[in-house]
C-alpha cells in the first residue's frame, strides 16, 4: 500500500509486519518463542552493538539481547557448560581485499571475524556464517579456517620443540579441532552458495581471505601468549597421542585376529 504522511514526529526507524498466509504456511502459522529467541541471539552476537528486543505478547515474555563482544562473546556463551583450558578466546577480526576470480582487475572486500577457544571435551563445535546466514555444511570459509589452523599450529609446535622425541607421529587437522569451540563469520558482497538453502558457501575468493586473516591472527596470538599457546598445543598433542595409541591397538587386534595360528614368518 502507498505510504501515508503522518506529519512531524521525533521517532525514527522502520516497522515491518509479517503475517503468514495460512493458505501457504498451513499447518504452521504459530510462532515458536524459543526458535525466535535462538535466532535473534545469533544475530545479536554476529552484529556487535545491535540492540534487539523480543516481546511475546501472548505470554508476556520479554528479553533484550545486546552483545558488545561479537563472536568472542558467542564462543564464551557456547562454552558456558564446558571447562575451557585457556581463559580468553582467540579473537581475530580483519577485512581482506581479495582479487576477484571473475575479474582479476577488481578487488572484493571480505570481512573475517572468528573466535576460538579449546575446552577439555573431545568434540568440535564449529558454527560458520556468511552475511549472518548459517552454513551447516561449511564451505570455502571453513576450508580457509582449517588450512590456516593446521599451518599455524604445526609450525609453532615444530619451531618450539614441543613434541617429544619419542612422539613419532604427525599432527593432523582432526587433532587440532578436538575440544575446539569456534564461531566464524564472514561478510562478502554477492556470495555464492551450493543451493537455495545456502547451507554451503562456494565463493572462491573467501578461502584465501580467511586463510590470510586467520594465519596472521593465530601467529600473533601464539607468539604473544606463550602460556596459553602451550596449553592449547598440549591439548592438540594429547589428541594426537590418543589417536596414535588407538591406531596401534587396532593393529595389534588385527594381527591377533588374522595372524593367530599361522607360522611366525607368515604371522608377521
Which residue ranges define each predicted feature?
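GHKL-family ATPase ATP-binding module
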Residues: 1-268
Amino acid at each position: 500500500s502507498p505510504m501515508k504522511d503522518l506529519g512531524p514526529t521525533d521517532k525514527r526507524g522502520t516497522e515491518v509486519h509479517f503475517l503468514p498466509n495460512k493458505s501457504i504456511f498451513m499447518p504452521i502459522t504459530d510462532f515458536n518463542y524459543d526458535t525466535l529467541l535462538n535466532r535473534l541471539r545469533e544475530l545479536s552476537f554476529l552484529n556487535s552493538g545491535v540492540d534487539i528486543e523480543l516481546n511475546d505478547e501472548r505470554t508476556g515474555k520479554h528479553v533484550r539481547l545486546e552483545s558488545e563482544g561479537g563472536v568472542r562473546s558467542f564462543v564464551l556463551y557456547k562454552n558456558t557448560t564446558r571447562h575451557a583450558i585457556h581463559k580468553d578466546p582467540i579473537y581475530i577480526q580483519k577485512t581482506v581485499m581479495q582479487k576477484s576470480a571473475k575479474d582479476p582487475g577488481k578487488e572484493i572486500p571480505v570481512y573475517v571475524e572468528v573466535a576460538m577457544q579449546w575446552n577439555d571435551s573431545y568434540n568440535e563445535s564449529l558454527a560458520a556464517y556468511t552475511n549472518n546466514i548459517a552454513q551447516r555444511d561449511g564451505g570455502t570459509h571453513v576450508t580457509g579456517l582449517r588450512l590456516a589452523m593446521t599451518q599455524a599450529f604445526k609450525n609453532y609446535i615444530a619451531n618450539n620443540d614441543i613434541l617429544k622425541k619419542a612422539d613419532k607421529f604427525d599432527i593432523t587437522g582432526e587433532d587440532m579441532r578436538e575440544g575446539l569451540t569456534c564461531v566464524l563469520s564472514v561478510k562478502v558482497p554477492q556470495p555464492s552458495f551450493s543451493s537455495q538453502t545456502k547451507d554451503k558457501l562456494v565463493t572462491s575468493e573467501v578461502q584465501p581471505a580467511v586463510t590470510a586473516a586467520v594465519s596472521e591472527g593465530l601467529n600473533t596470538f601464539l607468539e604473544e601468549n606463550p602460556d596459553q599457546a602451550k596449553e592449547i598445543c598440549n591439548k592438540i598433542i594429547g589428541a594426537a597421542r590418543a589417536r596414535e595409541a588407538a591406531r596401534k591397538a587396532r593393529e595389534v587386534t588385527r594381527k591377533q585376529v588374522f595372524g593367530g595360528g599361522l607360522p611366525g614368518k607368515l604371522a608377521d
